[in-house]
Amino acid sequence: MALSGVYDLFNDKWCNQTVWIFSDTHFGDTDIKKVCPNRPSDEELVKNINSKVGRKDTLILLGDIGDIEYAKQLRGYKVLIAGNHDAGMSNYSDVFKEVYSGALIIGEKLILSHEPVEIPWMFNIHGHDHAGAKRKNHLNVCADAIGYFPINLNQYLKTGILSKVESIHRLTIDKATERKNKRMKKR
């Protein structure tokens, strides 16, 4: 399942497959407890993830994985969008079926990334922000922001969240209308 495969997960033919999304496991990082003192152990984090993700499910991790040995224990078809702490980790392709070094755009309104991305006509699912700051048209799936369990992406998208995002076409028309109205007022 290549890039088109990840995109296909969101089409009707994949509706029986569950897609989970999560970020910032930081496996093996002893300093993370200084930032997030209530964080569970690496072993507990693996258990939390595997308690949700089945062997036939897809798990999309949005970066900052850490120790690859823990990632090997995770279930499912694993996809990685690398984060800022994943630089130089060449062995990720041994564990993940798909590895992306940058953001992944899915359809016209959804972008998956490690760090938050501000694109007015897209909904951004990201990690990186351990404090869990709220942003319009964003979902932060950083482990520390969502209670250390992955989110069922299928169920989340079924809430209609993408329908609340204005399309680039609507934004373009609105901007053009606004400019026209300003010109008319000046006359």
Residue ranges of predicted features:
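N-terminal active-site segment of His-dependent metallophosphoesterases
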Residues: 1-70, 159, 170-183
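A general structural motif
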Residues: 16, 56, 75-77, 121
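Hydrophobic "anchor" residues on beta-strands that sit immediately upstream
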Residues: 20, 60, 79, 123-124
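Active-site flanking residues adjacent to catalytic metal/cofactor-binding acidic residues
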Residues: 23, 62-64, 83, 113, ...
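Helix-adjacent hinge/juxtasegments
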Residues: 61-101
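Conserved beta-sheet core of the metallophosphoesterase superfamily
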Residues: 87-178
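Long, low-complexity, intrinsically disordered segments
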Residues: 185-187
